[in-house]
């Protein structure tokens, strides 16, 4: 039987400054995950060697995930019937992934320590005139490989201390353009995405 013993800790902090014509927001978050993955054999018929509840594998995963960010919204035009805003969102993200122990499928060692440094920016422009709203934005998003990506692809050679099959982080470029028309009786909108 495969089992987990997980613990997750974290915290979030943010501050906001509102003024005319610029709003600012700063913040960050940090999380720490501890995961023990293990398997036991509860009973094996005709086994003279293995005790009941024999633990046949165990591996430990540690993941640190921390980020800081800054956001700004600049109201270039701020009239009752016409508004134009420019915004930017900048995020730095750090991820550390540590793993050790034994693989549950082929009983090979799983030592691994990997660090990722990500910069995730987003910028956009919105224009509103009476019932019309036009918005455009560009963003870059990054994501680290999952535990399964490492478990299923990485091979560790204990004699050389080298790895093969290390997965890479994913990067997404997101372009968006949207239009909305609002009337007291109805609203209609369309969004275009390119990633």
Predicted features, each with a name:
Residues 89, 180-182:
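Eukaryotic, compositionally biased intrinsically disordered regions
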Residues 1-104, 124-128, 189:
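Face-selective signature of the C-terminal outer-membrane beta-barrel domain
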Residues 106-108:
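Short, flexible/disordered intra-domain loops and linkers
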């Amino acid at each position: 039987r495969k089992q987990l013993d997980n613990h997750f800790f974290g915290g979030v902090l943010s501050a906001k400054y509102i003024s005319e014509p610029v709003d600012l927001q700063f913040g960050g978050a940090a999380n720490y995950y501890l995961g023990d993955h293990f398997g036991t054999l509860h009973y094996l018929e005709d086994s003279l060697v293995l005790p009941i509840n024999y633990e046949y594998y165990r591996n430990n995963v540690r993941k640190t995930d921390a980020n800081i960010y800054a956001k700004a919204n600049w109201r270039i035009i701020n009239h009752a019937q016409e508004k134009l805003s420019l915004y930017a969102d900048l995020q730095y993200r750090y991820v550390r992934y540590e793993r050790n122990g034994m693989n549950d499928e082929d009983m090979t060692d799983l030592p691994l320590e990997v660090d990722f440094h990500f910069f995730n920016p987003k910028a956009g422009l919105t224009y509103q005139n009476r019932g019309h709203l036009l918005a455009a934005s560009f963003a870059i998003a990054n994501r680290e490989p999952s535990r399964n990506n490492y478990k299923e692809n990485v091979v560790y050679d204990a004699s050389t201390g080298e790895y093969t099959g290390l997965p890479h982080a994913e990067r997404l470029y997101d372009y968006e353009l949207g239009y909305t028309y609002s009337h007291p009786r109805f609203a209609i909108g369309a969004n275009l995405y390119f990633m």
